[in-house]
């Protein structure tokens, strides 16, 4: 009898706990509904974060959020406690230094060696301190100096040789330029991180580097599953390993880590690299030697973060730049005419100072940045205080992010927003340029603007100038489109960009 009573009592407690849990869920959901009832958005987004996560898993989150903005307006609730904005004033306030809004927990996905690089630093003051250590290194006046620019120019010429070899091999003048661009961006990034003496040699034929880069792109396609469903991702990894009898398919991130640590050891063990070369490793080592309390883990995390971000951003941006010029022969010819008028340095490439001021090239690249942003747009911030943007009140601790796609395609700012039209930049008055630039955030905005912007522009403009000084390009299939996945680095679907090359006459 006591046993029966005990079982009955335990069952009653279990039922009560279940009911209390359900009641808590109902109360919390009701509170959230009431708290954000004034912010429009899909009904499913109001009650669960799983709806927007579904589009994340489908690699369509940024595109879907931009679609919701077209439907609901500049403020959209995309999940309980999460709001997306496409209002320019609100965006600038959200990311301003004065707001001091920390980054969200999403950036915990970018921890390396249990340390936070600048990109993953959530708190405003922590980010400001770390950024202050290296910001001068990334300034245009620094990266445009000969010791960084000349090795990059040499790699431009190496990339052109690769393209020529592929043209001959194909027999039809068709080349997939994306892997070549990726190798070029990787070699440039590793040179900036470790110094030219210890950079990678993907352009020169290092198959290990090339294989690693290809696997990193495939690995990123699974990023949303890894971040949102880690147990499922572990199961998929195990199943693939058993089926293929190899762990190589999902080992790219671990292999990159090992590669980076080996290269770090070689760099720090080489007295010449610490004395004669400017690099991120050399900079941080110098700070440590002068008393800055920077741990080994921080140095390692900064290295890996720069390797990921540097090569991925330039690969996507440059691939889309040549894609748009190939798809728009009129603007390609305008760029070529402009390039023909520029003086050349000893290596045959245009003088950088004048190239960087070439207005038509600048306008074309800006249009490419606008139409195809180089990142996912998940620049999430946690509101440090209750905030009001016009008539919209958003409470403290809400996760807020700006939709880059929605801002870049806003028909109230951009006439025929989906059209590649560099003329909008070339014919605009100074006041109109300022108005366009307020809605133009390819490298972010505010206190956390991308540090590598100047180095990225150097790589992109030099590569474009080299191609179109010598060749005409067209799409392999005329009129084809090259859409983007909604991955962290906004990779092109298919991971390729096949162009038809023809030597200029």
Curated annotation (Swiss-Prot):
InterPro entries, A to Z: Cyt_P450 (IPR001128), Cyt_P450_CS (IPR017972), Cyt_P450_E_grp-I (IPR002401), Cyt_P450_sf (IPR036396), Cytochrome_P450_monoxygenase (IPR050121)
Signal peptide feature range: 1-23
Family designation: Belongs to the cytochrome P450 family.
Protein name: Cytochrome P450 monooxygenase FGM1
Membrane spanning residue stretches: none
Domain of life: Eukaryota
Knockout or disruption consequences: Produces significantly smaller lesions and fewer spikelets with blight symptoms on susceptible wheat cultivars.
PROSITE patterns in the cross-refs: CYTOCHROME_P450
Function: Cytochrome P450 monooxygenase; part of the Fg3_54/C64 gene cluster that mediates the biosynthesis of the octapeptide fusaoctaxin A, a virulence factor that is required for cell-to-cell invasiveness of plant host. The 2 nonribosomal peptide synthetases NRPS9 and NRPS5 form an assembly line which likely utilizes GABA as a starter unit (loaded on the unique module M1 of NRPS9) and sequentially incorporates seven extender units composed of the residues L-Ala, L-allo-Ile, L-Ser, L-Val, L-Ser, L-Leu and L-Leu, respectively.
SUPFAM superfamilies per UniProt: Cytochrome P450 (SSF48264)
Induction, per UniProt: Expression is positively regulated by the cluster-specific transcription factor FGM4 and is induced during infection of coleoptiles of wheat seedlings. The fusaoctaxin A gene cluster is silenced by H3K27 trimethylation by the histone methyltransferase KMT6.
EC number(s) from the headed UniProt entry: 1.-.-.-
Gene Ontology molecular function: heme binding; iron ion binding; monooxygenase activity; oxidoreductase activity, acting on paired donors, with incorporation or reduction of molecular oxygen
Residues bearing attached sugar chains per UniProt: 188, 351
Cofactor: heme
PANTHER family: CYTOCHROME P450, P450, PUTATIVE (EUROFUNG)-RELATED
Keywords: Glycoprotein, Heme, Iron, Metal-binding, Monooxygenase, Oxidoreductase, Signal
Pathway(s) it belongs to: Secondary metabolite biosynthesis
EC class: oxidoreductase
List of residues binding heme: 450
């Amino acid at each position: 009898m006591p046993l029966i009573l005990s079982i009955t009592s335990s069952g009653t407690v279990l039922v009560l706990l279940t009911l209390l849990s359900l009641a808590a869920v109902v109360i919390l959901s009701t509170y959230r509904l009431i708290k954000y009832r004034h912010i429009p958005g899909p009904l499913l987004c109001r009650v669960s974060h799983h709806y927007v996560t579904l589009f994340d898993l489908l690699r369509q989150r940024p595109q879907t959020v931009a679609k919701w903005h077209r439907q609901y307006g500049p403020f959209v609730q995309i999940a309980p406690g999460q709001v997306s904005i496409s209002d320019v004033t609100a965006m600038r306030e959200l990311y301003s230094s004065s707001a001091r809004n920390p980054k969200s927990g999403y950036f915990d996905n970018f921890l390396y060696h249990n340390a936070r690089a600048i990109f993953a630093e959530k708190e405003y003051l922590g980010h400001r301190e770390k950024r202050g250590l290296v910001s001068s290194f990334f300034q245009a006046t620094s990266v445009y100096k000969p010791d960084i620019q000349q090795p990059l120019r040499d790699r431009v010429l190496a990339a052109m040789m690769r393209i020529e070899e592929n043209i001959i091999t194909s027999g039809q003048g068709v080349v997939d330029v994306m892997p070549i661009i990726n190798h070029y961006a990787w070699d440039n990034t590793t040179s900036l991180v470790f110094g030219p003496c210890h950079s990678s040699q993907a352009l020169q034929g290092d198959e290990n580097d090339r294989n690693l880069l290809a696997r990193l792109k495939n690995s990123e396609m699974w990023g949303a599953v890894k971040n949102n469903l880690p147990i499922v991702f572990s199961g998929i990894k195990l199943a693939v390993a058993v089926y293929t009898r190899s762990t190589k398919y999902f080992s790219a991130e671990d292999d990159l880590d090992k590669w980076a640590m080996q290269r770090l050891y070689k760099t720090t063990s080489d007295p010449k690299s610490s004395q004669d070369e400017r690099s991120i490793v050399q900079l941080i080592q110098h700070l440590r030697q002068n008393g800055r309390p920077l741990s080994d883990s921080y140095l390692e995390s900064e290295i890996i973060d720069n390797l990921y971000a540097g090569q991925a951003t330039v690969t996507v941006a440059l691939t889309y730049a040549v894609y748009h010029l190939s798809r728009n022969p009129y603007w390609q010819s305008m760029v070529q005419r402009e390039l023909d008028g520029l003086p050349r340095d000893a290596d045959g490439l245009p003088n950088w100072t004048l190239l960087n001021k070439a207005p038509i090239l600048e306008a074309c690249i800006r249009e490419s940045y606008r139409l195809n942003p180089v990142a996912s747009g998940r620049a999430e911030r946690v509101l440090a205080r209750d905030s009001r943007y016009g008539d919209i009140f958003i409470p403290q601790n809400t996760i807020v992010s700006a939709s880059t796609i929605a801002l870049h395609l806003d028909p109230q700012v951009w006439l025929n927003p989906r059209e590649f039209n560099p003329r909008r930049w070339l014919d605009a008055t100074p006041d109109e340029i300022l108005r366009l630039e307020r809605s133009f955030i390819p490298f972010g905005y505010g206190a956390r603007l991308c540090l590598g912007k100047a180095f990225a522009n150097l790589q992109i403009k030099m590569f474009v100038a080299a191609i179109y000084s010598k060749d005409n390009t067209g799409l392999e299939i005329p009129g084809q489109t090259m859409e983007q996945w909604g991955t962290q680095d906004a990779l092109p679907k298919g991971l390729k960009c096949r162009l038809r090359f023809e030597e200029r006459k």
